[in-house]
């Protein structure tokens, strides 16, 4: 198996259910994302929080405008996550209060609208969000509401496969190949950020392979002794030492977590570790080769909430909530059974930056 990311190499959880087909992102307003913050500004403090609605703009473009036109040093700009360009998105930013009077300059940035602003006591930081609400139009579907609802019901019962989406792997899915060379050779050209991102793409592909292997082994909704499991209600992780935890996994209270290999992550034991080692062995990789990078664990699946399907003259509207760090494309591929999810921005997911 090679290191080029191809979505079709990863199995569907709902393989036995038909997809609705269709197209997404024909227009930016077809893909709407609303950030759900971990907290709201208190109304006092030295940091100004503001909510922007943007269309046709990446998060990075807004950051650069705040830096170059408003005059805020980039390290003082706060953002909880990155959002795609070809979408209509709402997300929070923060800047030091002393730049408050210059915020009106945002009127000069086409495609951006200021919705709210208030003060808070700390800078907004990566991962300071609960997740995202999505409202997505599937145009020209071949299936209808019943087919989409059947898939979403299964995903609500079993959890959404937490695959990394195409955004993570670059044009043509080649970034893991470049990351592999960096891991093996220990050096390469490019900025530290770029190197971290490329190795992150390799980590992400190995994680996706781990998810697929657990599915093939019948362990998607199970935990085994030696797994590190995540509690979905609290986010806490623990080592599975009691066979009785399997019942909690079946109820989607807990899920197995897979590795983003590095030097600082809880390592699985026994059978669970052997599954991880099998993925590494496919590519002749060893755990110690990732010691120069931080590590983390990521759940094999995420709960699906607030889901709804509505039929409209223009197609099917899907609404749902996913926790931070997960990808809407992982849900959409299950519903549509189509891999050509185009117009995706090749940006890293900052919610998982600690693992890179």
UniProtKB/Swiss-Prot annotation:
It comes from the Bacteria. Residues 159-302 form the TRUD domain. The keyword Cytoplasm does not apply. One of its GO terms (cellular component) is cytosol. Pfam families: TruD. The keyword Lyase does not apply. CDD domains: PseudoU_synth_EcTruD. GO terms for biological process: tRNA pseudouridine synthesis. The active site is at residue 84. PROSITE patterns: TRUD. It catalyses: uridine(13) in tRNA = pseudouridine(13) in tRNA. Keywords: Isomerase, tRNA processing. GO terms for molecular function: RNA binding; tRNA pseudouridine(13) synthase activity. It is an enzyme of class 5 (isomerase). Its EC number is 5.4.99.27. This is tRNA pseudouridine synthase D. It comes from Thermus thermophilus (strain ATCC BAA-163 / DSM 7039 / HB27). The lineage of its organism: Bacteria, Thermotogati, Deinococcota, Deinococci, Thermales.
């Amino acid at each position: 198996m090679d290191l080029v990311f191809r979505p079709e190499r990863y199995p569907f959880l709902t393989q036995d259910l038909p997809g609705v087909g269709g197209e997404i992102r024909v227009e930016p307003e077809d893909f709407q994302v609303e950030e759900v913050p971990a907290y709201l500004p208190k109304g006092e403090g030295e940091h100004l929080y503001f909510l922007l609605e943007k269309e046709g703009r990446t998060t990075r473009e807004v950051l650069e405008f705040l830096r170059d036109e408003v005059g805020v040093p980039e390290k003082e700009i706060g953002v909880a996550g990155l959002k795609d360009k070809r979408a209509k998105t709402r997300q929070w930013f923060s800047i030091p209060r002393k730049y408050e009077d210059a915020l009106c300059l945002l009127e000069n940035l086409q495609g951006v609208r200021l919705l709210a602003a208030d003060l808070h006591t700390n800078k907004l930081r990566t991962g300071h969000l609960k997740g995202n609400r999505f409202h997505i139009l599937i145009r020209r579907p071949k299936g209808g509401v019943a087919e989409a609802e059947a898939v979403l019901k299964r995903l609500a019962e079993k959890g959404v496969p937490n695959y990394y989406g195409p955004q993570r792997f670059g044009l043509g899915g080649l970034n893991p190949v470049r990351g592999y060379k960096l891991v093996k050779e220990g050096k390469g050209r490019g900025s530290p950020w770029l190197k971290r991102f490329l190795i992150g793409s390799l980590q992400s592909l190995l994680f996706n392979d781990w998810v697929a292997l657990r599915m093939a082994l019948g362990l998607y909704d199970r935990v085994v002794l030696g797994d590190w499991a995540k509690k979905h209600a609290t986010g806490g992780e623990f080592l599975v030492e009691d066979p009785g935890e399997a019942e909690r996994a079946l109820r989607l209270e807990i899920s197995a977590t897979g590795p983003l290999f590095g030097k600082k992550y809880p390592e699985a034991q026994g059978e669970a570790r052997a599954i991880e080692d099998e993925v590494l062995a496919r590519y002749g990789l060893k755990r110690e080769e990732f010691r120069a990078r931080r590590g983390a664990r990521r759940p094999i699946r995420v709960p699906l909430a607030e889901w709804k399907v509505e039929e409209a003259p223009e197609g099917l509207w899907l609404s749902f909530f996913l926790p931070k760090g997960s990808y809407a494309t992982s849900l959409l591929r299950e519903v549509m059974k189509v891999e050509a999810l185009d117009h995706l921005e090749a940006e890293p997911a900052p919610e998982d930056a600690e693992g890179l």
